[in-house]
Amino acid sequence: VVSTGSTNDLRISFERRAELTLSAARVAALYRYPVKGFSAERRSSLDVLPSGKVAGDRVLAFRFGGIEVLGDAWSPKATMLCLMNTPGLATLTLALDQDQGCVSVGSEGRTLAEEALDAAGRQRLAEKLAEFALSLPENPLVGHPERLPLQLVGDGVTPRYHDSEKGEVTLHSRESIQALAAALGGELDEVRFRSNIAVEGVKPWGELAWVGRRVRIGRCLYEVTRVKGRCLATHANPTTGVRDLPILTTLTHAFDQEQPTFAVSMRPLGEGGRIMVGDDVELLDV
């Protein structure tokens, strides 16, 4: 959680973003999300694959029944059980053990399910998640019997179920978190934004000016391709599952954004590689 800091001007002119550059930036935290829309897994390192995706990231998803998609193929998040449509999922802890090929589901320190990723285990996990979702006041299953049974898709290895089929690595600065927290008047957990990389040492919103530029992180070189549009998933408190902060309207009203954006997407220039907490971050195209 990042506390608010004082600020004299919460409104930033995004025409001046090119002025916002790096100052001794470093990687502060790394995350991946093995199951689409569920728990963050904090890491000391991440391996970025030649495909441009993080190894072990979004390798599974709970997809609605009746979706006409071939096998484990990618589909939009609107076809899945996720924080955007079911904020209460944030109260669950889902852990993937890739070595053992199993998924465990926990809540408030209790294990609700632990199953292998075989056909029978996937069915039991899907049934448990559907039962849990239907118990929540906000869920996409009530009144939609065609969305059942849920299907647990993915091979547990291949990164696939990102917001876009292209995937890519996502990054935000903690200075931007602090600026947004100040506008909201409270504390803000960066996990709301589900980025892979959090950096420190960047002026607030400076990373938004990196689009089209090259960034070196440790020994790896990336091109920043676009800013990241946001959805209602960011409104869900990562601990309580309650939609408790107006993230989207704050981004547009307090910071003059036409569309709510936070963080950037990047692709590796080359074969990818390993990113470590503490790695230097260098903007090459100043």
Where are these regions (language model features)?
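Metal-cofactor-dependent catalytic cores
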Residues: 2-286
